């Protein structure tokens, strides 16, 4: 990853560009993905317990950032009818929002008006309450309903779902519900946390917390493979997924019984256009540092190069049939061995 700093490692992978100090450079991959057609979805870009960046793209592609289910309910639950403007007032407000006077044109040089109007449109959609119905995770939903299916897939107790909606599985369930109901085209999820185990808590906490996160990812993939879209095809057939961390932990145990930050890490990519069931690259047997590889074969090659975040971005986007111009100035190298022919 080229860094041992949490913020730098996270933002480097989110955008595919090395940060400017601690500040992200460029836009998140999910924002580029949503920018393909931001007007098509109610929530083009859903961001759950992680970061998101938009540098110069359509403001509608910016993520709806939430920490968890409680935030989602706050944003999407319908307004109190007593607080909604009367018809005449609502009409007048809309006319003001979309007026095209000289002031609006001057302000929009920096896209402020465009961004404000995009937010206004989303506020209208969210305030009506129709989107909330997809996330109204009630107790004991009707058998066979989408909510009941999500509970079963992610191991959520239907009798008391609220105790688990803040877990890794709960966050993955929210992502699955958004994607399979046509509400969004890009979701970023902070699946696991509490992994910065420098002390002897490593032995107990690292395994259980990673297992919870990986189980959520596995259940998500399984659910997408088993759930059909309106055309009768699995959602997984047109989906891509990437799982990463800020960096890895050192192979050696430190003097406190934990593991420190490590410069090399791994990443999971899967889905549309990706040739799975393989490991690309390897680490050295002596110090476990990453070895340079031939990107066309995935095999170690002293004349090759290390895999970098922009290479991962480019490969995943290429597999999905999308442009990877977002990292074109990073000289990305496609991992040809990871792409379906």
Task: State each model region's role.
Residues 194-341:
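Feature marks hydrolase-like catalytic cores characterized by long aromatic- and Gly/Pro-rich stretches
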Residues 26, 30, 168, 309-313:
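A structural signal for well-ordered alpha-helical scaffolds and beta->alpha junctions
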Residues 16, 20, 56-62, 148, ...:
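Surface-exposed intrinsically disordered loops and tails
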Residues 34, 38, 77-80, 179-180, ...:
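Hydrophobic/aromatic-lined pockets within catalytic cores
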Residues 3-7, 37-41, 167-171, 178-183, ...:
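Extracellular/periplasmic catalytic domains that process cell-envelope and extracellular macromolecules
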Residues 100-230:
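Anion-binding catalytic surfaces of enzymes that hydrolyze or transfer phosphate/sulfate esters
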Residues 12-14, 42-49, 185-190, 240-243, ...:
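Structural recognition of the beta-strand scaffold that forms the well-ordered cores
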Residues 2-134:
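A contiguous, mid-domain pocket- or channel-lining segment that forms the substrate-recognition surface
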């Amino acid at each position: 990853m080229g860094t041992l700093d949490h913020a730098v490692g996270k933002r480097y992978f989110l955008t595919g560009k090395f940060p400017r100090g601690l500040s992200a450079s460029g836009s998140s991959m999910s924002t580029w993905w949503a920018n393909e057609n931001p007007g098509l979805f109610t929530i083009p870009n859903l961001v759950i317990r992680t970061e998101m960046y938009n540098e110069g793209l359509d403001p509608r592609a910016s993520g709806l950032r939430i920490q968890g289910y409680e935030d989602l309910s706050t944003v999407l639950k319908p307004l109190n009818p007593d607080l909604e403007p009367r018809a005449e007032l609502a009409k007048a407000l809309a006319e003001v929002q979309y007026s095209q006077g000289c002031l609006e044109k001057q302000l929009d040089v920096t896209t402020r008006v465009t961004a404000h109007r995009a937010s206004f449109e989303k506020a209208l959609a969210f305030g009506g309450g129709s989107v909330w119905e997809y996330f109204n995770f009630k107790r004991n939903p009707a058998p066979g309903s989408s909510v009941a299916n999500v509970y079963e897939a992610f191991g959520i107790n239907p009798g008391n779902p609220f105790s688990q909606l803040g877990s890794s599985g709960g966050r993955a369930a929210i992502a699955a519900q958004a994607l399979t109901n046509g509400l969004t085209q890009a979701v970023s999820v902070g699946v696991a946390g509490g992994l910065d185990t420098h002390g002897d808590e490593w032995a107990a906490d690292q395994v259980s917390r990673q297992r919870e996160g990986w189980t959520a990812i596995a259940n998500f993939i399984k659910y997408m493979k088993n759930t059909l879209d309106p055309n009768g095809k699995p959602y997984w057939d047109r989906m891509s997924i990437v799982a990463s961390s800020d960096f890895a932990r050192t192979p050696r145990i430190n003097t406190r019984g934990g593991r420190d930050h490590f410069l090399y890490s791994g990443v999971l990519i899967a889905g549309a256009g990706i040739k799975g069931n393989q490991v690309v690259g390897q680490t050295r047997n002596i110090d476990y540092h990453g070895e340079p590889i031939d990107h066309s074969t995935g095999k170690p090659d002293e004349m090759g190069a290390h895999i970098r975040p922009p290479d991962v971005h480019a490969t995943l986007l290429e597999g999905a049939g999308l442009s990877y111009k977002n990292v074109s100035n990073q000289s990305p190298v496609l991992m040809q061995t990871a792409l379906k022919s």
